[in-house]
Amino acid sequence: MAGRKSSTPTRHKMHVKTGDTVQVISGRDKGKVGEVIKTLPKSSKVVVKDVNIRTKHVKPQQEGESGQIQTFEAPIHSSNVMHYSEKEKVASRIGYQLTEDGRKVRVLKKTGEVID
């Protein structure tokens, strides 16, 4: 039974969540800062506002209607983004800490800033 695929898709652990501020660290949009709009855990990708803009040419659906050119944000791989501190203006990896009340929070390693 070697090589049999599982029926359930694998979901990868994401280091970013919706609403996080991130900086693109590689690719065409390297250096851009934006907010994560959507996460796609099955493919380990994220959609970042105003990053990886694509154009789509849409054909007219009805007679007499004109075609359109739409722009949208395409997903990029989560390994190509890094958390960004707005206060310090620096990108950083994250770590996890327990607070006094027992909550596990995400912390930027370079600045010590608590994310959530």
Curated annotation (Swiss-Prot):
User: Could you tell me the keywords of this UniProt record?
Assistant: Ribonucleoprotein, Ribosomal protein, RNA-binding, rRNA-binding
GO-annotated molecular function: rRNA binding; structural constituent of ribosome
Gene Ontology BP, a term? translation
**InterPro entries registered for this protein in UniProt:** KOW, Rib_uL2_dom2, Ribosomal_uL24, Ribosomal_uL24_CS, Ribosomal_uL24_KOW, Translation_prot_SH3-like_sf
Keyword RNA-binding belongs to the record: yes
Record's family?
A: Belongs to the universal ribosomal protein uL24 family.
Q: How does it assemble?
A: Part of the 50S ribosomal subunit.
Protein name (Swiss-Prot/TrEMBL): Large ribosomal subunit protein uL24
Q: Which organism is it from?
A: Picosynechococcus sp. (strain ATCC 27264 / PCC 7002 / PR-6) (Agmenellum quadruplicatum)
